[in-house]
Regions:
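A structural signal for multi-pass alpha-helical bundles of membrane permease subunits
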Residues: 4-8, 12-247
């Protein structure tokens, strides 16, 4: 039976491995191709005459004397000062994630332990708010920001991104808190802890996987945002995504 099962599973294993390898190639090709083209001159990578120029670097060799060149990176990071956009992105993402996780952890724990029906409706309102198009929410901030001279600065963009990401963090962390037994809170209180001490010293250590997971999603949402950052930031304070779109 074992030999028959192994013989029957061998074609399936080959088919599964082949599918995974093909899928990896298809998914990785755009990134590898873009990375390869970044070391070529524009005439090679965007050549309409012969796509093989992007491979052999014919024009790159003529213009630079080599098959590869780092002129594109120098032009972007030094001449166009792309490092400013990278620094702005790091600042925006860091504060957005920290504030979102802090408020989401406190709010999610409170809603999970409240035991009242209004907790469900608050989460539903948050979900509706999260489902609204970002461009609709941002347009409501533009006029006040212009009147109060707040437009174009990083703190205002961080506030808006936190407001947009907060419903998501509430939902995620609330669901994680629901999976933690309330007996842990009660045991901590029996040992003399207050509600906040039980939350800090007992619940949070158990919640770290959920906090890290939610933080990763919040990081991706803030890092990849285009609508908010492109509309609320000036050219000098742009993050990486709108800066890349402007090249």
């Amino acid at each position: 039976m074992t030999s028959r099962a192994s013989k029957a599973s061998k074609p399936l294993m080959i088919a599964s491995t082949s599918f995974v390898l093909i899928w990896i190639f298809v998914a990785a090709f755009p990134f590898v191709w873009t990375l390869w083209g970044s070391f070529k001159v524009q005439g090679d990578f965007f050549s309409k005459a012969d796509w093989r120029y992007a491979l052999n670097g014919t024009r790159t060799a003529i213009e630079t004397g080599g098959l590869f060149t780092g002129a594109g990176y120098e032009g972007a990071w030094v001449q166009q000062e792309f490092w400013r956009a990278a620094l702005n992105t790091a600042i925006v993402v860091l504060f957005t994630v920290v504030i979102s996780l802090t408020l989401g952890t406190l709010g999610g724990y409170a809603l999970a332990r409240s035991g009242h029906n209004y907790a469900f409706w608050l989460l539903m309102i948050a979900l509706v708010f999260r489902a609204m198009p970002h461009i609709t929410l941002v347009s409501g901030y533009l006029l006040p920001f212009f009147e109060w001279n707040l437009w174009g600065h990083l703190p205002t963009t961080i506030i808006v991104l936190v407001a947009i990401n907060q419903p998501f963090t509430l939902w995620m962390l609330h669901s994680f808190f629901l999976n933690i037994p309330k007996d842990l809170d009660e045991s901590a209180k029996v040992d003399g802890c207050t509600q906040f001490q039980a939350f800090r010293h007992v619940i949070i250590p158990v919640m770290w996987p959920g906090v890290i997971t939610t933080g990763l999603f919040s990081f991706l949402l803030a890092y990849n945002d285009f609508a908010v950052t492109s509309m609320l930031l000036s050219k000098d304070n742009q993050t990486m995504v709108p800066a890349i779109a402007g090249f």
